[in-house]
């Protein structure tokens, strides 16, 4: 057992282990990744919809704390329609076992799912997003002289671009937002 304790014995509903969804707000994934630049460290915690890989909400912080994870989850929950109770899949990190996170999940009727211990392939969609983000946005850039505030602005701008404009072949060469608009799922 980790130092954070185990607040939920069987955290994964049997039907939850999937990376695809046939409609928005069926299965979400979340994770935290770190960026190190000369000015310090920044942490990103997105909520990604497995329907189309759209980052629905995210938090960026200089501290990987529960407030960061809770903020991204609350931002996503505020967009739920009536009767929508998605599965939210995460790794077994402390953020996802704290009473605050569990309380938000309970309040919004979210079904929690957690990766098996030490099994990063269980959260492959999140790892894939981070890999793409770091290749396109982070690696190969000289971040010398960039303040943390500016870095966070640039990271946020990239995520907005990824959601609204990044063309993805698996979505018929459309961005996640355009894909939803074409299906009549977004305004």
Task: Describe these PLM feature segments.
Residues 1-187:
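Charged DNA-binding/catalytic regions of mobile-element recombinases
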């Amino acid at each position: 057992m980790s130092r954070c304790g185990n607040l939920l014995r069987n955290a994964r509903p049997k039907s939850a282990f999937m990376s695809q969804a046939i409609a928005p707000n069926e299965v979400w994934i979340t994770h935290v990744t770190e960026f190190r630049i000369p000015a310090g460290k920044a942490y990103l915690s997105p909520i990604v919809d497995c329907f189309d890989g759209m980052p629905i909400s995210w938090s960026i912080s200089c501290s990987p704390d529960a407030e960061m994870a809770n903020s991204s989850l609350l931002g996503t929950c505020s967009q739920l329609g009536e009767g929508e109770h998605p599965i939210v899949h995460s790794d077994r990190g402390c953020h996802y076992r704290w009473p605050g996170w569990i309380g938000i999940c309970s309040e919004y009727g979210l079904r929690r799912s957690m990766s098996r211990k030490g099994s990063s392939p269980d959260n492959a969609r999140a790892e894939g997003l981070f890999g793409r983000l770091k290749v396109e946005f982070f690696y190969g850039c000289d971040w010398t002289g960039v303040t943390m505030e500016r870095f966070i602005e640039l990271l946020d701008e990239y995520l907005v671009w990824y959601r609204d404009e990044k063309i993805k072949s698996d979505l018929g060469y459309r961005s996640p937002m355009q894909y939803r608009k074409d299906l009549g799922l977004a305004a």
